[in-house]
A protein has these predicted regions:
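Conserved, mostly hydrophobic/aromatic
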Residues: 3
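Beta-strand-rich recognition/accessory modules
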Residues: 8-9
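Short proline/glycine- and polar residue-rich coil/turn motifs
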Residues: 94, 223-230
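Short, surface-exposed secondary-structure junctions/capping segments
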Residues: 129-138, 229-240
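Residues that form or immediately flank small-molecule/cofactor binding pockets and catalytic motifs
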Residues: 133, 209, 221
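Aromatic, loop-rich ligand-recognition surfaces of beta-strand-rich domains
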Residues: 154-217, 231-278
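Solvent-exposed serine/threonine-rich low-complexity stretches and specific carbohydrate-binding patches
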Residues: 215-225
Length: 278
Protein backbone atom coordinates (compact mmCIF):
# COMPACT_ATOMS: atom_id res chain seq x y z
CA UNK A 1 0.00 0.00 0.00
CA UNK A 2 2.86 2.42 0.60
CA UNK A 3 4.08 1.89 -2.96
CA UNK A 4 0.59 2.77 -4.17
CA UNK A 5 0.57 5.89 -2.01
CA UNK A 6 3.98 6.92 -3.36
CA UNK A 7 2.76 6.44 -6.93
CA UNK A 8 -0.34 8.49 -6.13
CA UNK A 9 1.83 11.36 -4.92
CA UNK A 10 4.27 11.13 -7.83
CA UNK A 11 1.77 10.92 -10.68
CA UNK A 12 -1.11 13.06 -9.48
CA UNK A 13 -1.36 16.77 -10.22
CA UNK A 14 -1.03 18.80 -6.99
CA UNK A 15 -4.53 20.23 -7.37
CA UNK A 16 -6.00 16.71 -7.58
CA UNK A 17 -4.20 15.12 -4.65
CA UNK A 18 -6.76 13.93 -2.12
CA UNK A 19 -5.95 11.44 0.63
CA UNK A 20 -9.60 10.61 1.37
CA UNK A 21 -10.15 9.85 -2.31
CA UNK A 22 -7.09 7.60 -2.31
CA UNK A 23 -8.38 5.65 0.70
CA UNK A 24 -11.75 5.08 -0.97
CA UNK A 25 -9.99 3.54 -3.99
CA UNK A 26 -7.55 1.49 -1.94
CA UNK A 27 -9.86 -1.49 -1.13
CA UNK A 28 -10.25 -2.30 -4.84
CA UNK A 29 -6.48 -2.19 -5.28
CA UNK A 30 -5.92 -4.47 -2.29
CA UNK A 31 -8.44 -6.92 -3.74
CA UNK A 32 -6.28 -7.11 -6.87
CA UNK A 33 -3.20 -7.73 -4.70
CA UNK A 34 -4.97 -10.63 -2.97
CA UNK A 35 -6.31 -12.06 -6.24
CA UNK A 36 -2.82 -12.11 -7.77
CA UNK A 37 -1.20 -13.54 -4.66
CA UNK A 38 0.94 -10.50 -3.91
CA UNK A 39 2.60 -10.36 -0.51
CA UNK A 40 1.88 -7.00 1.10
CA UNK A 41 1.76 -5.49 4.57
CA UNK A 42 -1.46 -6.41 6.34
CA UNK A 43 -1.42 -3.66 8.98
CA UNK A 44 -3.35 -1.42 6.61
CA UNK A 45 -6.35 -3.48 7.71
CA UNK A 46 -5.76 -2.87 11.43
CA UNK A 47 -7.85 -0.64 13.66
CA UNK A 48 -6.45 2.78 14.49
CA UNK A 49 -7.07 3.65 18.15
CA UNK A 50 -7.32 7.37 18.86
CA UNK A 51 -7.23 8.43 22.52
CA UNK A 52 -7.96 12.06 23.34
CA UNK A 53 -7.94 13.51 26.87
CA UNK A 54 -11.08 15.33 28.04
CA UNK A 55 -9.43 17.28 30.89
CA UNK A 56 -12.53 19.07 32.15
CA UNK A 57 -14.22 15.71 32.65
CA UNK A 58 -11.19 13.73 33.81
CA UNK A 59 -11.89 11.12 31.15
CA UNK A 60 -10.32 9.69 28.02
CA UNK A 61 -12.28 9.63 24.77
CA UNK A 62 -11.55 6.56 22.69
CA UNK A 63 -12.36 6.39 18.99
CA UNK A 64 -11.67 3.57 16.52
CA UNK A 65 -11.11 3.99 12.79
CA UNK A 66 -10.24 1.92 9.73
CA UNK A 67 -9.37 3.18 6.28
CA UNK A 68 -12.46 1.50 4.80
CA UNK A 69 -15.02 1.91 7.62
CA UNK A 70 -14.96 -1.80 8.43
CA UNK A 71 -16.98 -3.29 11.28
CA UNK A 72 -15.04 -2.99 14.56
CA UNK A 73 -15.33 -5.10 17.70
CA UNK A 74 -13.48 -4.29 20.91
CA UNK A 75 -12.84 -5.14 24.56
CA UNK A 76 -11.67 -2.97 27.46
CA UNK A 77 -10.68 -5.68 29.95
CA UNK A 78 -7.70 -7.16 28.15
CA UNK A 79 -9.61 -10.12 26.75
CA UNK A 80 -9.17 -11.11 23.12
CA UNK A 81 -11.88 -9.53 20.94
CA UNK A 82 -13.94 -11.51 18.44
CA UNK A 83 -17.18 -11.02 16.52
CA UNK A 84 -19.15 -11.56 19.74
CA UNK A 85 -17.39 -8.65 21.46
CA UNK A 86 -19.11 -5.24 21.65
CA UNK A 87 -19.62 -3.56 18.28
CA UNK A 88 -18.11 -0.09 18.06
CA UNK A 89 -20.66 2.56 17.14
CA UNK A 90 -19.54 5.78 18.84
CA UNK A 91 -16.84 7.37 21.00
CA UNK A 92 -16.17 5.58 24.28
CA UNK A 93 -15.29 7.42 27.50
CA UNK A 94 -13.29 5.88 30.36
CA UNK A 95 -12.00 7.17 33.69
CA UNK A 96 -10.06 4.16 34.97
CA UNK A 97 -7.29 1.79 33.86
CA UNK A 98 -8.22 -0.11 30.71
CA UNK A 99 -6.56 -2.48 28.26
CA UNK A 100 -8.10 -1.70 24.89
CA UNK A 101 -8.08 -4.33 22.16
CA UNK A 102 -9.88 -4.07 18.84
CA UNK A 103 -10.27 -5.93 15.55
CA UNK A 104 -11.79 -5.02 12.21
CA UNK A 105 -13.99 -7.66 10.60
CA UNK A 106 -14.25 -7.98 6.81
CA UNK A 107 -15.47 -10.72 4.44
CA UNK A 108 -11.94 -12.13 4.18
CA UNK A 109 -11.62 -12.34 7.97
CA UNK A 110 -10.52 -10.38 11.02
CA UNK A 111 -7.57 -8.03 11.21
CA UNK A 112 -4.71 -8.30 13.65
CA UNK A 113 -5.46 -7.06 17.16
CA UNK A 114 -4.75 -3.39 17.86
CA UNK A 115 -3.93 -2.69 21.48
CA UNK A 116 -3.48 0.28 23.82
CA UNK A 117 -3.30 0.60 27.60
CA UNK A 118 -4.41 3.64 29.59
CA UNK A 119 -3.08 4.03 33.13
CA UNK A 120 -4.82 6.50 35.44
CA UNK A 121 -3.59 8.47 38.45
CA UNK A 122 -4.81 11.75 39.96
CA UNK A 123 -3.07 13.75 37.20
CA UNK A 124 -4.39 11.71 34.28
CA UNK A 125 -6.78 13.52 31.95
CA UNK A 126 -6.53 16.73 34.00
CA UNK A 127 -5.76 20.23 32.66
CA UNK A 128 -2.03 20.89 32.44
CA UNK A 129 -0.07 24.01 31.55
CA UNK A 130 3.49 23.99 30.22
CA UNK A 131 5.47 26.73 31.97
CA UNK A 132 8.57 25.87 29.94
CA UNK A 133 8.57 25.12 26.23
CA UNK A 134 9.73 21.78 24.75
CA UNK A 135 12.14 21.66 21.84
CA UNK A 136 10.25 22.52 18.64
CA UNK A 137 11.07 19.12 17.11
CA UNK A 138 9.72 17.20 20.10
CA UNK A 139 6.62 19.13 21.18
CA UNK A 140 4.08 16.85 19.46
CA UNK A 141 0.73 17.28 21.30
CA UNK A 142 2.29 19.41 24.01
CA UNK A 143 1.22 19.19 27.63
CA UNK A 144 -1.61 16.74 26.98
CA UNK A 145 1.06 14.12 26.19
CA UNK A 146 2.00 14.13 29.87
CA UNK A 147 -1.47 13.35 31.21
CA UNK A 148 -2.97 11.04 28.56
CA UNK A 149 -2.22 7.82 30.47
CA UNK A 150 -0.15 6.46 27.58
CA UNK A 151 3.43 5.37 28.15
CA UNK A 152 5.92 5.50 25.30
CA UNK A 153 8.41 2.94 24.04
CA UNK A 154 12.05 3.74 23.31
CA UNK A 155 11.21 5.69 20.16
CA UNK A 156 11.34 9.32 21.28
CA UNK A 157 9.97 10.43 17.90
CA UNK A 158 6.75 8.44 18.31
CA UNK A 159 4.72 11.33 19.72
CA UNK A 160 4.36 9.65 23.12
CA UNK A 161 7.17 11.78 24.60
CA UNK A 162 7.92 15.49 24.71
CA UNK A 163 11.54 16.63 24.86
CA UNK A 164 13.16 19.59 26.59
CA UNK A 165 16.62 20.69 25.44
CA UNK A 166 18.78 22.32 28.09
CA UNK A 167 15.58 23.39 29.86
CA UNK A 168 13.78 22.09 32.92
CA UNK A 169 10.29 20.68 32.56
CA UNK A 170 8.00 22.98 34.55
CA UNK A 171 4.27 22.23 34.45
CA UNK A 172 1.20 23.14 36.47
CA UNK A 173 -1.60 20.64 36.99
CA UNK A 174 -5.19 21.54 37.83
CA UNK A 175 -6.91 18.70 39.70
CA UNK A 176 -10.20 20.65 39.29
CA UNK A 177 -10.90 20.35 43.02
CA UNK A 178 -8.79 20.20 46.19
CA UNK A 179 -7.47 16.69 46.80
CA UNK A 180 -5.14 15.11 49.32
CA UNK A 181 -1.84 14.21 47.66
CA UNK A 182 1.41 12.80 49.00
CA UNK A 183 3.62 11.83 46.04
CA UNK A 184 4.54 12.88 42.52
CA UNK A 185 6.42 11.09 39.74
CA UNK A 186 7.81 11.80 36.29
CA UNK A 187 8.58 9.05 33.80
CA UNK A 188 11.67 9.84 31.74
CA UNK A 189 13.72 8.26 28.97
CA UNK A 190 17.39 7.37 29.28
CA UNK A 191 19.26 7.19 25.97
CA UNK A 192 22.72 8.60 26.56
CA UNK A 193 23.88 7.96 23.00
CA UNK A 194 21.37 10.56 21.81
CA UNK A 195 22.12 12.91 24.72
CA UNK A 196 18.86 12.03 26.48
CA UNK A 197 19.46 11.99 30.22
CA UNK A 198 17.10 11.65 33.16
CA UNK A 199 16.12 14.39 35.56
CA UNK A 200 18.65 15.48 38.21
CA UNK A 201 16.08 17.00 40.52
CA UNK A 202 12.36 16.93 41.21
CA UNK A 203 10.53 19.77 42.95
CA UNK A 204 6.85 19.94 43.87
CA UNK A 205 4.81 23.01 44.79
CA UNK A 206 1.11 23.20 45.69
CA UNK A 207 -1.53 25.91 45.65
CA UNK A 208 -5.21 26.44 46.39
CA UNK A 209 -5.70 29.33 43.96
CA UNK A 210 -3.17 28.64 41.19
CA UNK A 211 -1.25 31.81 42.03
CA UNK A 212 0.38 31.39 45.42
CA UNK A 213 2.48 28.22 45.57
CA UNK A 214 4.47 26.68 48.40
CA UNK A 215 7.13 24.02 48.04
CA UNK A 216 6.37 20.66 49.67
CA UNK A 217 9.11 18.46 48.20
CA UNK A 218 12.55 18.66 46.62
CA UNK A 219 14.88 15.80 45.82
CA UNK A 220 18.08 15.46 43.80
CA UNK A 221 19.02 12.53 41.57
CA UNK A 222 22.50 11.59 40.32
CA UNK A 223 23.56 12.18 36.73
CA UNK A 224 23.12 9.06 34.60
CA UNK A 225 26.26 6.93 34.65
CA UNK A 226 28.30 5.79 31.66
CA UNK A 227 27.09 2.48 30.27
CA UNK A 228 23.49 2.95 31.38
CA UNK A 229 21.23 0.94 29.10
CA UNK A 230 18.45 2.55 27.09
CA UNK A 231 15.35 2.48 29.28
CA UNK A 232 12.54 4.48 30.84
CA UNK A 233 12.87 5.52 34.48
CA UNK A 234 10.25 6.67 36.94
CA UNK A 235 11.57 9.24 39.43
CA UNK A 236 9.32 10.11 42.36
CA UNK A 237 9.17 12.15 45.55
CA UNK A 238 6.97 11.60 48.58
CA UNK A 239 5.90 14.17 51.16
CA UNK A 240 3.49 14.67 54.04
CA UNK A 241 -0.10 14.51 52.88
CA UNK A 242 -1.38 17.92 51.79
CA UNK A 243 -4.63 19.15 50.27
CA UNK A 244 -4.30 21.14 47.06
CA UNK A 245 -5.98 21.80 43.73
CA UNK A 246 -2.96 23.04 41.76
CA UNK A 247 0.36 21.21 41.64
CA UNK A 248 3.51 22.54 40.04
CA UNK A 249 6.06 19.90 39.03
CA UNK A 250 9.61 20.89 38.13
CA UNK A 251 11.86 18.18 36.68
CA UNK A 252 15.40 19.51 36.34
CA UNK A 253 17.37 18.73 33.20
CA UNK A 254 20.93 17.39 33.45
CA UNK A 255 22.92 20.68 33.45
CA UNK A 256 25.42 19.52 30.83
CA UNK A 257 26.66 16.30 29.30
CA UNK A 258 29.31 14.65 31.52
CA UNK A 259 33.01 14.31 30.73
CA UNK A 260 32.64 10.69 29.59
CA UNK A 261 30.12 11.60 26.88
CA UNK A 262 31.13 12.09 23.23
CA UNK A 263 29.88 15.70 23.49
CA UNK A 264 31.05 16.74 26.98
CA UNK A 265 29.75 20.07 28.20
CA UNK A 266 26.93 20.28 25.66
CA UNK A 267 23.27 20.62 26.61
CA UNK A 268 21.25 17.50 27.43
CA UNK A 269 17.73 16.47 26.48
CA UNK A 270 15.05 15.58 29.01
CA UNK A 271 12.23 13.44 27.58
CA UNK A 272 9.06 12.82 29.61
CA UNK A 273 6.01 10.78 28.61
CA UNK A 274 3.90 10.79 31.79
CA UNK A 275 3.62 12.67 35.06
CA UNK A 276 1.68 11.37 38.02
CA UNK A 277 0.17 12.40 41.33
CA UNK A 278 -0.95 10.09 44.12
Amino acid sequence: PRMAALSEIQWTEPSHKNFDSFLKRLPALLAIYRDRGYDFRQDIYDVNIDIVPAPDEGKARIAFQTFDDAEIHYTLDGSVPDVQSPLYTDTIQVDKDVIIQAIAVRPQGASQISKEEIHFNAATMRPVTLNTIPHKSYTFKGGSTLIDGLYGDMNYRSGRWIGFYGTDMNVTLDLLEPKEVSSVFVNTMLNTGDAIFGTTGLKVEVSEDGKNFRRVASEDFPVVEKGTKMQSRKDSVSFDKVKARYIKIIAEVTPKLPAWHSMPGEKAFLFVDEIGVE
